[in-house]
Amino acid sequence: MDNVRVRIAPSPTGYLHVGTAHTALFNWLFARHNKGTFILRIEDTDLARSTKEYEENIIEGLKWLGLYWDEGPYYQTQRLDLYRKYADELLKKGLAYYCYCTPEELEERRKEALAQKKPPRYDRKCLYLSDEERARYEREGRKPAIRLLVPEGKTVFNDIIRGEIEFNNEDIGDFVIMKSDGIPTYNFAVVIDDYTMGITHVIRGEDHISNTPKQLFIYNAFGWTPPEFAHLPLLLGPDRSKLSKRHGVTSVTEYKKMGYLPQALVNYLALLGWTPEENREIYTVEELIELFDLRRVTKNPGIFDVTKLEWINTQHIRRLSLEELADLTYPFLKEAEWFKEENFNKEYYLKVLSLLQERLKTLAQIKEYADYFFVDDLDYDVETVKKVCKHPDTPLYLEKIKDVWSQLSEFTAENLEASLKKLAEENQIPTKNLVHPIRVALTNKTVGPGLYEIAEVLGKEKTLKRLEKFIQFLKTL
């Protein structure tokens, strides 16, 4: 496909939503697959709600996901003269007209139409104003909006994903393209931008289907060839309603803070509404680019399932090298304030991660799993200790294993296991009667990685100290 040009055009009226990220990703994959151009356009004409903070969040979120753009960002507020120029052109052609109706008048006529069971479209009152009436409105200080003259008949377009879609023009009515304050409406600005930026494919959510006929009227009024349209399925919550905050986290920034990998979120979002030919679920970004095909996008909505995202994140964490995992988890580890930065031992941390990597579902979980590798003063839970130390001779056996382990010249998992099993055999006790209490002694947890591997990473000195402390704790019960 030659000279593909697509865009993502967020409004900076909120933080980057996973739905916007989903649309951005599909545009980006389409551009990269076809060696085309991906453009970022900031639609900031909602002056009351647009903020710099939201804009920066959107830009940083796209960068974090790796969705870098080739052109932009372009800003609609910097193009107001351009929109006015094209609106004036339509006025001159007689394809648009000034509308002096006030919001109150429009609302009254809308209610009247609904009461008469008619569609509440504009009644073209201002299309037929005399020069004298216009002059009177001007003297009253009314500032006119500009409406497009909608042609009669039907509007049909072919959607790449949904096939042929048809609209009755009379159901739409003449709509405003420039507001009375000189700001263009969404549909007008979008068409001018897409045309002047040479957009070849408009790939967006299905909630924009109803905007398409209005945009086609504008293309036709100028005699321009419209781009191809592809309307993606929306993301829904597990209850099949539109994804919103009540379903949990919806902002890309929050997923970053929770310790999700960008490549995992990209992998997951790509599979919402698109089915690759290959029957698997874990993909690299490079594989997604190679396989992406708009024709395999479904009409069915994508159900955003955090449990599935978590599973995909787990798989991507397991693919990381220990060095990569160390770099990515370190900011979360630092938040726990278990050590002074100048005392941080990278080599030791890599050993810790070799035990925890398989257990991490998110990067942030390092704070949940790694505490006992950095905190020596474990606060044992009495009920847990009583549960795992039911045998009255547990303190005695722990003293014995402490003595045995203190004499090991090589403090390896293999030697630790062999010596413990030998002691258990000699004393005719199940190994679990030693393993479970020792695990609690070393970690203050009842589950975790292999006990002997934990002891090896902690090292001889820490292991023996914790055993001694635990033995003394048992004597107080």
Swiss-Prot record:
A motif ('KMSKS' region) lies at residues 242-246. It catalyses: tRNA(Glu) + L-glutamate + ATP = L-glutamyl-tRNA(Glu) + AMP + diphosphate. Its main location: cytoplasm. Its EC number is 6.1.1.17. CDD domains: GluRS_core. Keywords: Aminoacyl-tRNA synthetase, ATP-binding, Cytoplasm, Ligase, Nucleotide-binding, Protein biosynthesis. SUPFAM superfamilies: An anticodon-binding domain of class I aminoacyl-tRNA synthetases (SSF48163), Nucleotidylyl transferase (SSF52374). A motif ('HIGH' region) lies at residues 10-20. GO terms for molecular function: ATP binding; glutamate-tRNA ligase activity; tRNA binding; zinc ion binding. It is found in: Cytoplasm. ATP binds at residue 245. GO terms for biological process: glutamyl-tRNA aminoacylation. One of its GO terms (cellular component) is cytosol. PANTHER family: GLUTAMATE--TRNA LIGASE, GLUTAMATE--TRNA LIGASE, MITOCHONDRIAL-RELATED. Monomer. Catalyzes the attachment of glutamate to tRNA(Glu) in a two-step reaction: glutamate is first activated by ATP to form Glu-AMP and then transferred to the acceptor end of tRNA(Glu). Belongs to the class-I aminoacyl-tRNA synthetase family. Glutamate--tRNA ligase type 1 subfamily. This is Glutamate--tRNA ligase. It comes from Dictyoglomus thermophilum (strain ATCC 35947 / DSM 3960 / H-6-12).
